[in-house]
Amino acid sequence: MSHRARHQLLALPGIIFLVLFPIILSLWIAFLWAKSEVNNQLRTFAQLALDKSELVIRQADLVSDAAERYQGQVCTPAHQKRMLNIIRGYLYINELIYARDNHFLCSSLIAPVNGYTIAPADYKREPNVSIYYYRDTPFFSGYKMTYMQRGNYVAVINPLFWSEVMSDDPTLQWGVYDTVTKTFFSLSKEASAATFSPLIHLKDLTVQRNGYLYATVYSTKRPIAAIVATSYQRLITHFYNHLIFALPAGILGSLVLLLLWLRIRQNYLSPKRKLQRALEKHQLCLYYQPIIDIKTEKCIGAEALLRWPGEQGQIMNPAEFIPLAEKEGMIEQITDYVIDNVFRDLGDYLATHADRYVSINLSASDFHTSRLIARINQKTEQYAVRPQQIKFEVTEHAFLDVDKMTPIILAFRQAGYEVAIDDFGIGYSNLHNLKSLNVDILKIDKSFVETLTTHKTSHLIAEHIIELAHSLGLKTIAEGVETEEQVNWLRKRGVRYCQGWFFAKAMPPQVFMQWMEQLPARELTRGQ
């Protein structure tokens, strides 16, 4: 599996996560939203139940206060009428009874001869408060009511009055709990004290049990608490309601993230960004192709050729990425990278081999200013390399602006660096421009060299270039030499310097230096 295929395979889970994350997040938010809403509703209902209980207790106190002001004979028709008139003004009081302790004597409706004695109260508080929960007495026969006694008067209350609240939730259940007697004194019809009892002590929490959600709220005024429950299905219903809004937002978020990811990926995988990363990670490397003096059969130097190893192992040559660097304004960065690496690779070697040189390729923009000269001077001084050991090549098509480039070339030459026109013959230079530029070397392009020993007429161009170079006193270097016949042809016409696979391919720096050390044992003209 290729590196790229592996990268794409590993990236697939990330892409899936990126697309699904906003949708999953929207589901989660919708659920939290629904849960919070149901929880708030439960706590609101519980608080309403407490408030309702507080109101009922308040009414019971008011009834007792009003009844205590009666000054006449008790359990007479007048007394009964007085009690009846009092309870008519209070919604949640069903009956009012006159009593002495737990001996109930008469109510607003009945006055038995001897009254009725009730079992001891469930709750007593000094000085005179008693509460009887779920008692079925002759005063309210057939119904289990709550009897709240203060002093001599007992308010009779329907247990449902304590906490009954209005709701659109048919599954809503509730109960009100006395924390002293540990008794539920009010329960909705469907509620079970056995179910509520283990949960009432979970203060200020919402819990899930047996398909229901439960919430409890404790009173800050009295020793009572309320618990409210609703079916878990209500949470699901709220979840679906919120999902109508949350899911489209999640899908939209997924689309936005996907588009953003595609944009970032496009930018990340763009040729410009790839080249930038290659420079930052020092992935570009230099190979060195020997330049041979075919008269002495010695290697006099090498051309530094920039290579970019691709992700799948292929090596890209400058023709593929230098135009990109020029277009994206990165060419100065490339040039500085090459110069730094040339001296890092061969600086020490050149310092100890004064008869060898390295030729560095430059772009047209490098000849628009003299910026590069100062950088080269600093490197030659740092490595103790002579200026004559560094030569520069620029392609012929770069010399379109002769007036602008001529003074820069002159500055290079005055600093001791020779300048060569690369790939001469395939561009637009004419004799006048060639004289004006005042370069040192002409390099014959490979496209002409490969036709030298064929019957094609293009070899005549090579002969013309050689004659032109001789007439101007320029050195010539033939590129792309691959056969001994080409070497002989060039030698006969006075070409002294060649490079190509016939002599050696471009090599990494360490291999090149080893090759140079073993050079005396080779016969160059045999292409070893």
Curated annotation (Swiss-Prot):
It catalyses: 3',3'-c-di-GMP + H2O = 5'-phosphoguanylyl(3'->5')guanosine + H(+). GO terms for molecular function: cyclic-guanylate-specific phosphodiesterase activity. The keyword Nucleus does not apply. One of its GO terms (cellular component) is plasma membrane. Residues 268-520 form the EAL domain. Keywords: c-di-GMP, Cell inner membrane, Cell membrane, Hydrolase, Membrane, Transmembrane, Transmembrane helix. It is an enzyme of class 3 (hydrolase). Its main location: membrane. It is a multi-pass membrane protein. Pfam families: CSS-motif, EAL. The keyword Transmembrane helix applies. GO terms for biological process: regulation of single-species biofilm formation. It comes from the Bacteria. Its EC number is 3.1.4.52. The chain crosses the membrane at residues 14-34, 242-262. Induction: Expressed during transition into stationary phase, at both 28 and 37 degrees Celsius. Expression is RpoS dependent. It is found in: Cell inner membrane. InterPro entries: CSS-motif_dom, Cyclic-di-GMP_PDE-like, EAL_dom, EAL_sf. Phosphodiesterase (PDE) that catalyzes the hydrolysis of cyclic-di-GMP (c-di-GMP) to 5'-pGpG. Cyclic-di-GMP is a second messenger which controls cell surface-associated traits in bacteria. Overexpression reduces biofilm formation. This is Probable cyclic di-GMP phosphodiesterase PdeC. It comes from Escherichia coli (strain K12). The lineage of its organism: Bacteria, Pseudomonadati, Pseudomonadota, Gammaproteobacteria, Enterobacterales.
